[in-house]
Amino acid sequence: MSEKPQQEEQEKPQSRRNSFAVIEFTPEVLDRCLKQVEFYFSEFNFPYDRFLRTTAEKNDGWVPISTIATFNRMKKYRPVDKVIEALRSSEILEVSADGENVKRRVPLDLTAARNARIEQNQRTLAVMNFPHEDVEASQIPELQENLEAFFKKLGEINQVRLRRDHRNKKFNGTVLVEFKTIPECEAFLKSYSNDDESNEILSYEGKKLSVLTKKQFDLQREASKSKNFSGRSRSFNGHKKKNLPKFPKNKKKNGKEESKEDSSAIADDDEEHKE
């Protein structure tokens, strides 16, 4: 009888850290693993990732590594002990002494990060109409890598974000592509924009794609939301007050007002790592 609790206690770490197939952690794999986690904590993701940010705020900046290991793009990195090993080599991140948690060495200046986000949006395009009807959740990581390879052949990019339907969390056929520079972004738009019929047609697996600026995409999304609220659509080129939905005043959560700007920014991000 006395051995059973001891056996269960020994099995818990095994379940948490070794529930997926073990892969060979070559130096290249360790580097990819580290860069992925550093991205989660970067100025381009952390301020706008509500789940990650609130988790850190509850624990003095620390986030459980076991939580990060459940993100879709991290599930392939097993055992988790190797992830911890990779994170210990980071110049940006710090691992707790017990190896259970990770945080930024230097906290982000959120105001500066939001200014960086504005500049980031200026070099981001929305590319729509990718095949998506038959894409299952288990196929998302592979699709992510395929789309990254697709766009890297066409320009210098920083990242590709897959958009999801907020109702069923499935890929909705739209990706946000962030380029390294504004000129790179403008050159891509000039080559593939649907506004000019003489432009080269951008396609993927035989399907013609549509290219919009981030601003055009946001206006289209707002128009769609407005139509859902009022039954009437708005022009993508302007805002008509009579068609704008009326939102209630910001509700207080835990004694603090929730920022409208913050909520809008979060809605722009895909949430692939939270499933």
UniProtKB/Swiss-Prot annotation:
Location of motif Nuclear localization signal in this chain is 240-256
Q: Which GO terms describe its biological process?
A: tRNA processing
**Location (main, coarse):** nucleus
The outcome of changing S235A is: Prevents phosphorylation
Cite the RRM domain residue spans from the record: 123-216
**Region spans: Disordered:** 222-275
**Cross-referenced SMART domains, in alphabetical order?**
LA (SM00715)
Q: Give the N-acetylserine positions (modified residues).
A: S2
- The residues covered by the HTH La-type RNA-binding domain are 23-112
Stretches of Basic residues bias are at 237-254
Residues found modified as Phosphoserine = S15, S19, S230, S233, S235
Q: Where located? A: Nucleus
Q: Which InterPro entries match?
A: La_dom_prot (IPR045180), La_HTH (IPR006630), Lupus_La (IPR002344), Nucleotide-bd_a/b_plait_sf (IPR012677), RBD_domain_sf (IPR035979), RRM_dom (IPR000504), WH-like_DNA-bd_sf (IPR036388), WH_DNA-bd_sf (IPR036390)
Gene3D superfamilies recorded for this chain? 3.30.70.330, Winged helix-like DNA-binding domain superfamily/Winged helix DNA-binding domain
Which residues constitute the signal peptide according to the record?
A: none
Report the gene name: LHP1
- Entry keywords, A to Z: Acetylation, Methylation, Nucleus, Phosphoprotein, RNA-binding
Q: Which residues carry this modification: Omega-N-methylarginine?
A: R104
PROSITE patterns named in the record = HTH_LA (PS50961), RRM (PS50102)
Q: What is this protein called?
A: La protein homolog
Species of origin: Saccharomyces cerevisiae (strain ATCC 204508 / S288c)
The molecular function terms in GO held by this entry are: mRNA binding; RNA binding; tRNA binding; U6 snRNA binding
Q: According to its record, what are the GO cellular component terms?
A: nucleolus; nucleoplasm; nucleus; ribonucleoprotein complex
| Biased amino acid composition, Polar residues | 226-236
> Where in this chain does the entry annotate a coiled-coil region?
none
Its quaternary organisation is: Interacts with SXM1.
